Amino acid sequence: MASSTAAVPFLAPPLEQLRHLAEELRSLLPRVRVGEAQETAEEFNREMFWRRLNEAAVKVNGEATVLTTHFSKLPWPSPQETQRICEQVRIAIEEIIIVYYSLPKDQGITLRKLVRNAALDIVDGMAQLLEVLLTAPSQSTENGDLISCNSVSVACQQVPEIPKDNKAAALLMLTKSVDFVKDAHEEMEQAVEECDPYSGLLNDSEDNSDSHSDEDGVLGLPSNRDSYWSEEDQELIIPCLALVRASRASLKKIRILVAENGKKDEVAQLDDIVDISDEISPSVDDLVLSIYPPVCHLTVRISSAKLVSVLIKALEITKASHVSPHPGDSWIPLLINAVDHCMNRIKALTQRAAEL
């Protein structure tokens, strides 16, 4: 005769439930990275979208606090209570992802990337918090320390700061690009002024030169003959520095045009400007790195050509877009001419290396 007593479902111990949830959240990350916007016949309601996203972020932040409060010290909650808490975390995380998917592509790819990155930071932050909590009791971690430093709370608090339209998103990304190139330009200028690109690194190492003189090769430090520019190198650096300066000027001008003339509904053109401008900073970095001794002139030539190609394309895309109401303005042709002049000079100085 079958027992009339209902079977009690088996629940894994709290530790296993948290570990499983962390793995589950990690598995969501690739899906969020490549996820497409949901197709819907309903008209997009921007105000409702941002309200839902902010509310979802607040919910996740609250669940992070609940997790921290219950699992940062022993005794842990029962398996049943752990199951309930984990389910609330799942629901909160799923809501963030669902809201992100509800943002249509026609609102702008740049804006969608910012919202996607925010969602990724939140999911990743929650997974990190779970992983920290798995070891917290044995390390006697204080609740206050966990709450103040867990990255999911930081990510949630950043959600209200996300730009609300594609023009604002484009300006944010262009500002970041300007700042990155500004830093690279200033770093390069300082190295040129000091004529000693490895001054900080080598000064530190020279203090221990007696005991570590044989270790330079192992540590990757440049030997003395490779730590300074030759006369040929210094001559080549001049047009390279001018090219980086032109990159900075171009990005600043593009950002100004977008700020003054950009239209929120011209999302495709704004996305194109941001996409090509995003390539400038990495190309500048490659060029700056290539001029550190020992300098390979062929590498400098290749890095310069790549940067010039990206720069001219960015200027041409900007000139052809709605942010340039007067395409005949002279600043774009002037910048293109300056860039071409730099490249021609670099080609002349690296011709021998190219022929080898």
Curated annotation (Swiss-Prot):
Region annotated Required for interaction with CCND1, chain positions: 2-205
Region listing for Interaction with RPLP0, in residue ranges: 2-187, 236-356
Region feature (Interaction with TCF3): 2-181, 147-356
InterPro entries: GCIP-like (IPR026907), GCIP-like_N (IPR049317), GCIP_C (IPR049318)
Keywords of the record: Acetylation, Cell cycle, Cytoplasm, Nucleus, Phosphoprotein
Record's signal peptide: none
KW Transcription (keyword) present: no
Post-translational modification (record): Phosphorylated.
N-acetylalanine: modified positions: A2
Cell compartments where the protein resides: Cytoplasm; Nucleus
Single GO cellular component term: nucleus
Tissue: Expressed at high levels in brain, intestine, muscle and ovary and at lower levels in heart, kidney, liver, lung, spleen and testis.
Transmembrane segments: none
Upregulation: Expression is induced by partial hepatectomy.
Region (Disordered): 198-224
Secreted in keyword set: no
Pfam family membership, one: GCIP_C
Similarity section: Belongs to the CCNDBP1 family.
Physiological role: May negatively regulate cell cycle progression. May act at least in part via inhibition of the cyclin-D1/CDK4 complex, thereby preventing phosphorylation of RB1 and blocking E2F-dependent transcription. May be required for hepatocyte proliferation.
Subunit structure: Interacts with CCND1 and GRAP2. May also interact with COPS5, RPLP0, SIRT6, SYF2 and TCF3.
Protein name from the UniProt record: Cyclin-D1-binding protein 1
Gene name, Swiss-Prot/TrEMBL: Ccndbp1
